Amino acid sequence: MTERTAVVLFTRDLRVHDHPALAAAVSAFDRVVPLYVLDPALQKLSPNRTRFLHQSLADLREALRKRGGDLVVRRGDPVAETVKLARKVGAEGIGLSADVSRHAHRRERRLRAECDRHRMFLRLFPGLTIVEPGALRPAGGDHYRVFSPYFRAWQGVRLREELAAPKRIRLPEGVDPGRLPDPPKGDSPDAAEGGESVARRRLTTWLPTLGRYDDIHDDMAGDDTSRLSPYLRWGCVSPLAVANRAGDRDGPFVRQLCWRDFYHQVVAGFPDLSTTAYRRGAREDWRDDPHALEAWTEGRTGMPIVDAGMRQLRAEGWMHNRARLITAGYLTKHLGLDWRPGLEVFFRWLLDGDRVNNSGNWQWVAGTGNDTRPYRGFNPVRQAERYDPDGAYVRRWVPELESVPGKAVHQPWRLPDETRRALDYPPPLEVPGADPVWLR
C-alpha cells in the first residue's frame, strides 16, 4: 500500500499544541513534512522579530524532533520552495493556517494556482484567532465596525475544540531538514526569548495574577501584564488555549484577546488598514516635522512619560500597552504628525509587530479608525500621574531624571531653574499654536 504524504507549511503558528493544520495532517496521512521557509524579503523588516522568529523556530524544531519528526527549513520564495518540496516528497497536498493580511492572501493565491497546476490540494485551517475572521457578520455588512456589538456576538460563539499536540510525527525518508541559522543579534538588548516552551511557561507563571488583572494591568511600573503579545503574534501559543486557561469570557483579559480577533475581522473586510484611514471622511491634515518625529522615535521629546515608553521599546522590543496609547496619542494629537510613520517605527522595533493589530490600534488613537472618538486627546501628564503615580516607570527608563522625586518627575519643566539646568534632559518639543494645558 502506498503511503500518503502531506506538507504542513508553518507561517505565524510556531507551535505543536492546538495546531489544527498539523493535527489534521498527522491524523489523515502516514508521513508529514512540517516546513518553514525563511523569506529573505521579510527578514529585513525588523532585526528584533527576526531574532525572535529564529528562536521560535529552534524551539519548534526541538518539539517536533521529540515526536519523531523534524522541522524542514528552506530559504527563498515561500511558494516556490513549498511546492518544490511537496513535489519532491510526493505529497498529495499542503495545509496551512488561514491569515488575513495582503501578504498572506498573495501567498494563498499563488499556492492555490501552483497546487491546481500540479494536482495537489491546498487546505486552510483556523488557529491564528479564537473566532475565525468572517465567522461573525453584522446585518448588512461583511465585518463589524464597532467593538462592543462584535464582543457581544463573539461571547456567544461556540468555540472549536482545543487540540493536543501530536504524539508522533513521521517524516518521509531521505528528506534533508536543512540548517536553521543561528539567531541574529537583533537591536534590543533586553528582548524576550521566542518559542512555544517559553510562551507556555510564561502563561503558567502569569495566570495566578489573572484575578487582579483589572486592577494591575495599567500599573506601568509594576508591569504585571502577561507579556504574551509576541507569542500570540508568532503563534507560539494558541489564542484559544490562552482564552481557555483564562476561563471567564466576560473578563477584562479575555476582552483584550477579543480585540485581537476584532481587528483580524476588520482587516479581512478592509485590507488597507495599515495605509488608509478606515473612518470615512477622517481629517488628515498632519504636519511635516522630521525633527519632531526623530525626537519622538529616539525618546527625547522632553515629555518624560513619552520618552520612557519609547526607550523601553528600543531596549526590549516591547512596550507597556498604556505607554503605547500615550506615545501614539502624543505623536498624533499633540505633535500633529501622521500616524503612519509612527506605525512604521513600532513595526520596526516591536516583537509583536504586525499589520493587523498595530494598524488598528494606531488608527484608533489617531481618530481615523474603528470605534474611535476622532477628537479624543491624551493628556500625557494626567496619564502619567494616574498610571505611574510615583514616577518609578519614568525613572527606570529615563535615568537623566532619576534624582527627581515622586510625581515631579512627570513635569521637569516646572522644577526650579537651578535644578532643571543640572539635568541632562531636553525641554518639551515646541509645536505651532498655543501651548497645551499641561505646559501652561
Q: Each PLM stretch: what is its role?
A:
Residues E3-R15, V32-D39, A58-R65, P189-S197, ...:
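Short charge-dense sequence patches
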Residues R49, L53, E298, G302, ...:
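Residue-level preference for long, well-ordered alpha-helices that form the structural scaffold
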Residues M1-E162, R249, R311, N357, ...:
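Trp/Phe/Arg-rich N-terminal binding region typifying the photolyase-homology
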Residues L22-A24, L57-L60, R110, V131-L136, ...:
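Intrinsically disordered, low-complexity boundary segments flanking structured domains
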